[in-house]
Each structure stands twice: as C-alpha cells, then as structure tokens.
Amino acid sequence: MTITLEEIVGIDVAKDKLDVAVLGQKATTEAFNTQKGITSLVKKMCQLKPKLIVVEATGGYEEMLVLGLFEAGLPVALVSP
C-alpha cells in the first residue's frame, strides 16, 4: 500500500489553537483548541479522509482533540515533539 503526502495531516497543538498542515500543501489552517473548534476540525478531517493524522503531545492540551479524532474513527497518532 502506498500513501501519498496529501493523505497525511500534522497538527501542532498549543493551549489556545491548533495549526493544521496537510503534507505537500503550502497553506495551513488554524482552529481554536476549544470544543467548538475541535468539532469543526474533526468534521473537516472526516471529509478529507486522511490515512494518518499526527498530533503533537503537549502535556494535556491535545487530549480533547485526540479523543474527538479517535471517536470519529480517524487514524490518529500521538507523538512527542
């Protein structure tokens, strides 16, 4: 199985915001690190259908995001920065 760059998403997590990048694309997206912002981002990820979403572990700020992605059935990996 071959995975193209467009099928991998990286999310940089901070207390107040999430920076989202799709590999192979220059543009990035921002979302608020709130329940509303995460819900919107999860919906977008469901439409994109990436093969992998890599989320930065940041001492707890990522928990709500990872749970939302996981509950939506999206492939998520939590990695140390």
Model-identified regions with their sequence ranges:
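Phosphate- and other anionic-substrate recognition elements at nucleic-acid/protein interfaces
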Residues: 1-81
